[in-house]
Amino acid sequence: AESTVKQAPVXAVAKAYNDYEEYSLGPEGLKDAMEXTGSNALVMD
C-alpha cells in the first residue's frame, strides 16, 4: 500500500508550529489549520 503521509524535517515542523500558533483548538480552528498547512494530520504538544 502506498503511503500518502508527507514527511517533513523537524525544522519545518517547528516553523509550521510557530506560524500556525494562532489557530484555535476547536473543530473550525483545526479544519482551518489543516487546510492552511496542507496536512492531513496535526500533532500538538
From Swiss-Prot:
One term of GO molecular function: toxin activity
Keywords: Enterotoxin, Toxin, Virulence
UniProt miscellaneous comment: This strain was isolated from a food poisoning outbreak in Norway in 1995.
Summary of subunit composition and partner proteins: One of 3 components (of 35, 45 and 105 kDa) of the enterotoxin.
Function according to Swiss-Prot or TrEMBL: One of 3 components required for cytotoxicity (tested in African green monkey Vero cells); the complex is not hemolytic.
Protein name: Enterotoxin
